[in-house]
Amino acid sequence: MSLLANRRFLKMHGAGNAIVVLDLRGTAVRVTPAEARAIAADVHSRFDQLMVVHDPVTPGTDAFMRIYNTDGSESGACGNGTRCVGYALLDDPAMARPAENGALTLETKAGLVAVKRITERSFTVDMGQPRLRWDEIPLAEPFLDTRRIELQVGPIDDPILHSPAAVSMGNPHAIFFVERDPDSYDLGRIGPLLEAHPIFPERANISIAEVTGRDTIKLRVWERGAGLTLACGTAACATVVAASRLRMIGRAARVALPGGELSIEWRADDHVLMTGPVYLEGEGTFSPDLFAGIDG
């Protein structure tokens, strides 16, 4: 029987991004890819990202997070999910532990992130520094300037999309800037083709962005390992960084996604801050039947 059977979880969302939070602190239990896929497939626990909270690894941090996509793969970062974990660790009766000034330091395989409460339902996450070198993103070929890389969709002489920016926020992103509504593009068809393009050795999140004002952006995202999503916090961060590097905006913007709005600031110290809402939908426990045939 899976060791996840009968364990409690929280069902949450941040700007429409469906999040499941699972607390495994105090145990040696680890989620397998097959278990993550089973959780994602169940109507009661369906998620865009599964945020699994483990005991801290690095002294001075509050917890270690493992982040799973719906296909069972792991991600190094999830901004919306991190806000939800922040809420759970500060407010959920079964998970909360004292934190100074409503602030937490969390660790993922990509590094440290700081979470701070702004209001009852709003949190800011310090997503750290963007990675802009081709080998840090990573890309399969050396590009001296990742503000635009050579990649296009459609005919050579009349491409549908071309020359995306490439940025890593702990996970790789390609952002296509366009001059019409991102909703007018068939991202559900384009996204999976580009996600697995050979230029991205670790696959990539694919975004289509329209700069609608000096500090406003409209964004659609195909999320690596998850598909079309209502919101992606790291994509919003990567898009603001990319747009700022291209001098389309300043260093801060409100990013409108189908599920809601996120406020992003790329500070002078190179750290990217993301502020947005969290919502608790409910809680549940995993049925043993959910993991039938899976060894935990």
Curated annotation (Swiss-Prot):
GO biological process: lysine biosynthetic process via diaminopimelate
Biological or metabolic pathway of the protein: Amino-acid biosynthesis; L-lysine biosynthesis via DAP pathway; DL-2,6-diaminopimelate from LL-2,6-diaminopimelate: step 1/1
Any one GO molecular-function label of the UniProt entry: diaminopimelate epimerase activity
Catalytic activity annotation: (2S,6S)-2,6-diaminopimelate = meso-2,6-diaminopimelate
Subunit: Homodimer.
PANTHER family (UniProt xref): DIAMINOPIMELATE EPIMERASE, DIAMINOPIMELATE EPIMERASE, CHLOROPLASTIC
Name of the protein this chain belongs to: Diaminopimelate epimerase
Record organism: Methylorubrum extorquens (strain PA1) (Methylobacterium extorquens)
